[in-house]
Amino acid sequence: MPTLSRVKPKLTFNKGIAGFFIFLHLGALLAFFPFAFSWSAVALMLFLHWLTASIGICFGYHRYLTHRGMDLPKWVANTIVFCGSLACQNGPIKWVAHHRMHHAGSDTERDPHSAKNSLWWPHLGWMIYKHPEFDDDKVIQNYTKDISDNKFYQFLEKNYIKNQFILGFIFLAIGGLPWVVWGIFL
């Protein structure tokens, strides 16, 4: 468990992550224009929401990685964890560390995404600000000893944003701008 000081910690703003989320929200505005709409794009959005949130985050990051709720063949585990990384809620190692910290100190000062401080923090703040105690490499390592040596998870940790751009280009090639707008931005 991180040792928290009584002094309010100095948070570091992550311009890259914040810029990425601004880019996503600005891109989402294109959904209001007819040239960025297709029913196949809507179907893609619904499918990706299920795949990234339900399978990737809930099943992969949460049940499988955080709580070790099951044993899976390596290729299945890697597939669902990859799907979780596409949700853009951080890479698997940091997400798991933060969630384990959350369970260790739910809604206290030891919770990295407690709603007690603000409505903003648990929804996006914890991802765009680096907290000196929760995001310290040694603390992350301490909470993720069972997964942090996995090379594939390390790759996803470093590249989950880049993977969005690769997926965006694939969607552009297959379904045009509507697939990018509805498959990436929304």
Which residue ranges define each predicted feature?
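Non-catalytic, topology-defining segments of multipass membrane proteins
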Residues: 1-186
